[in-house]
Amino acid sequence: MAEPPQQTPAALGFSMPAEWEPHRATWLGWPHNPTDWPGKLDTIRWVYTEIVRWIAPGEAVRMLVNSRTEEKLARKFLTRAGVGLRRVEFIVHPTNRGWTRDSGPVFVRRNVGQAVSPAVRAKTAIVHFHFNGWAKYSDWQKDRRVPETAARRLRKRLFDAQWKGRQLVLEGGGIDVNGRGTLLTTEECYLDPKTQVRNPGLGRQELEAALKEYLGVTNVFWLGGGVAGDDTHGHVDDICRFVNPTTVVLVREDNPGDINFRPLAENWERIRDLRLEDGSKPEVVALPIPGPLFFDGNRLPASYANFYIANRAVLVPTFNDPNDRVALGILGELFKDRAVVGIHALDLVLGFGTLHCLTQQEPAD
């Protein structure tokens, strides 16, 4: 049962951990919607097997499937690719799409050393932000219920995200945290008053207050816009990511003639003002961006910042681009405790997202 609005995660000692902290599992949604990848669905399924192959050795994989028939299909693909199924759990939950980062459960964890109510025993819980298809698409009703299914399956407390009597809309790809209290997001995604408006009438101060209550953060920093072609309208996980508590990578476009040059340059100006939760300045590492990719005349949101940090590996989207090697080298230096692996994402990005968009971490207790 969802908690009443006054019992927020922060009030009960919960906060969102960083992605590099230990996971119990990674959540994925087996691809089934042909409109996301026209004519490419089987190709995408093979990419999923590669994703699971690298994640499963270090943690469980919880795979949402539309039906038992889809489960059989997923098992067939994974088995043929040599992926052991011992650590793969299949959960039947019909979905509209497979972008689990945005519609899936957002986990928070309680600091066991923090004094809270004796009634709060669980170390982890789920926040149900109310997915609405990025305020763009009409088919989201099945996706919205994924956090409820996750809470029942795991027997976790479910916090119903509301603010001033309204359901609060947020996607996992629209935020990034360092696990110490600082959260990154963008104005394009959550403050644009005209385009893909998630929470009409809620301004900067109200959204910051809501983020602090439901994710347990103390410090919110706003970047400007995202990359061209991002149909979510400015998700931060395509431009700027924490890689440890005091370091971020920030995407940079060096070609003044590219449409991404100006908004990304503005973010580099803004990042100078970023202070962490303790008032210190973070280290900022430049991450390149691949050359322009188009399909049917549309710019695709190809970005190396859409990597996913699993327990034993960091999965990085690659695009048959000379900058693939550069990005892998930069991230390899930043994640020396994990294998940094390139995952071919030219087909994935046709659906306007890649690795981070598909995955959602479940932290260890």
Q: Where are each of the predicted segments found?
A:
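The feature marks the mature, well-folded catalytic cores of soluble enzymes
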Residues: 1-113, 120-365
